[in-house]
Amino acid sequence: ERRIQILQTLAAMLEQPGAERITTAALSSRLDVSEAALYRHFASKAQMFEGLIDFIETSVFTLINQIVERDADPRTQVHKMLTVLLQFGEKNPGMARVMAGDALVFENERLIARMNQFFDRYESQLRQSLR
């Protein structure tokens, strides 16, 4: 699907060294489509970043939920949860830039707030496991 291709390309562009601010013009050029074609799938660049954040949340919390269901030992849960987050960032350097907020500096502030909510939820899950 084109939406997934757009998000994958955006994430790949974020992996590039020195990728400060990614423009829709650069993204459309990389995909060899018009900017209008991007906007047929996403109303704004902020929505594209929201798509990446959705992917991050789904990926990380699906694994965390599996850890909580399978492991009764709180220390094991916390260790595995930390490992999940670190390995996700390592395997997805473009997404790690979104998670750290580096890729969101010049974007809509609600995206930074959304990543903060992700980490609040992550921290809450860690605390819950330690109770």
Where are these regions (language model features)?
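Residues within the helices of the helix-turn-helix
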Residues: 25, 36, 46
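Alpha-helical structural segments
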Residues: 4-12, 16, 29-30, 47-70, ...
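Ser/Thr-centered, proline-biased regulatory motifs
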Residues: 20-29
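Short coil/turn segments at alpha/beta junctions that flank glycine-rich nucleotide-binding fingerprints
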Residues: 16-20, 71, 92
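Short acidic, glycine/proline-rich loop/turn micro-motifs
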Residues: 64, 109-112
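A helix-boundary/kink motif common to multi-pass secondary transporters
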Residues: 18, 43-44
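Short hydrophobic/aromatic patch on the recognition helix
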Residues: 32-42
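Amphipathic alpha-helical segments used for helix-helix packing
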Residues: 90-110
